[in-house]
Amino acid sequence: MRVVAKIGTSSITTDSGSVDRDAIVALCADVARLRRDGHDVVVVSSGAVAAGVPAVGLPSRPSDMETLQAVSAVGQARLMQVYNEVLEGHGLIGAQVLLDPHDFVDRTQYLHARQTLGRLLELGCVPVVNENDAIASTELRYGDNDRLAALLAHNLSADVLVLLTDLDGLHTADPRTDASASLVTRVAADDPLLAIATSSGGSGRGSGGMASKLSAARIASWSGVRTVIARASRDGVLVDAVAGTAVGTTFDAHDRRLPARKLWIAFAAEVGGRITVDDGARKAISTRSTSLLPAGVVSVTGEFENGSTVEVADQGGVVFARGMVAASASDLRGVVGRRTAELPAGMTHEVIHRDDLVVLPG
């Protein structure tokens, strides 16, 4: 099997923010056991910023971009040093792979990442992946590493995604504040994964919470990948999750896997704007998988160019689809509501072609 395992900042750092070597030792022991059993394992590890904070003498996590990026560069080196030392103790070679949003927005980079990671696995290495925070040109957090791990699971055609955290899994309420909260052990593939109310906040040392993990599970499910959310400190948690032993919360893989191109449009591409459509267009798109025509467009929000990815919403503001537009925002505003016969010469007859349009799952 091919496994993507993500461990969060709060699970591999101490309260002071330093790297918790024991946590990495436990994780790598599971990785080594899986490797001995013939499985490929990719680790997605948070913790660079948290590990860098005490190293540079700061009292707490900074909030400004420049300091966050600088601290990330310091912390990433320390984090990877620990991984390399521990993996070498098992006769394994760690390989640092840093990714940024461009690697999931640009199709060429997306495929290049797949080839590089695939080759590392062929060579017997254990890729340790993190977001390339130190040189991010926009927001430091591209979603979060939960989403990154889910996109990698799709990219690598993984069999299972394991999200390791400081909770036992998904609960009916936040167990840290509600004593009546109970563990949800399984979520079916046809269950709207994001409909369950969760606390979106993570720990003070990380950027992800349960809401981001549910979003990641949704991406993975529609990639045909089983997902498990479980407590990182549980003995043998990664091995048990891969084996299918009852641990944490399991999200079943959907039996209808979205093609790579459509999954990329739905979950990975940067959104440049929004197109609001009338009820007739929504019904045609949702039930008959038709293209979106200018006649069905009610309004255009944002500034985007031909080829950009946009949200498609109904008149109630509900986003139900995403797609790659065949014209710029300025051109589309000039043809809102027009029938094909009324379009100016040279104007595309399809705002979004059906092959570039994805009705969002759930």
How should these model regions be labeled?
Residues M1-R61, M65-I93, V97-G362:
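C-terminal catalytic "cap/lid" subdomain
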